[in-house]
Design a protein with these regions (language model features):
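Beta-strand elements of well-folded, non-transmembrane domains
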Residues: 10-12, 56, 109-113
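Glycine-rich portal/gate segments that line the openings of hydrophobic small-molecule binding cavities
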Residues: 28, 38-83, 102, 135-150, ...
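Beta-strand/loop substructures that line and gate deep hydrophobic ligand-binding cavities in soluble
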Residues: 79-131, 151
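A short, structured loop/turn motif at beta-sheet edges
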Residues: 11-15, 68-73, 93-102
Length: 164
């Protein structure tokens, strides 16, 4: 099993960061995939299912995401239902420290194909997923710390209040 973890500190309220983390449009921007079925707009909640489609490494990809745990505003987990991985799980943990939000994302995955899967995981997917995760966290930080968050959360009163 491969594990990838990354953390970012965000100068924005915890609730805003949590909601942005669950926002489907923002996830689509960072993954370069499109939600096709299930919940395709807004923010995910417990029990939601989404089918994502896109191209990765020159191949069409389908990835079904299930929201398997949802504990706002501190934690949610998405787990692959169907897709190219043997197993894929992504934990999103958020907490507040000194008026800032700390967001830690941890992904765990395994691939089919035994030894070949482990080689592909180590040399191709771990670096690729690490870069994608870092890009997602930096984008989330940029949006949360600016007025851009209003585009993704136009109706969220709780997201409007600063923790400073």
């Amino acid at each position: 099993m491969f594990t990838i973890s990354d953390t970012i500190h965000i100068d924005a309220p915890l609730e805003r960061c949590f909601l942005l983390s669950t926002n489907i449009e923002l996830v689509a921007l960072s993954l370069h995939m499109k939600p096709l079925e299930g919940k395709t707009t807004g923010c995910v909640v417990a029990g939601d299912k989404l089918l994502w489609a896109g191209w990765k490494f020159g191949f069409p990809q389908m990835h079904e995401t299930l929201i398997t745990r949802y504990e706002p505003p501190h934690f949610f987990q998405d787990t692959m239902g169907r897709g190219r991985f043997k197993r894929f799980q992504h934990d999103h943990r958020l907490y507040s420290v000194d008026g800032r939000t700390v967001l830690n994302d941890k992904l765990r995955f395994t691939l089919p194909l035994g030894f070949l899967g482990r080689l592909v995981g180590k040399h191709i997917l771990v670096p690729y997923i690490s870069r994608t995760l870092r890009r997602r966290l930096v984008l989330l930080k940029k949006i949360a710390e600016s007025e851009d968050w209003r585009h993704f959360l136009p109706d969220e009163d709780t997201a409007k209040h600063s923790s400073h």
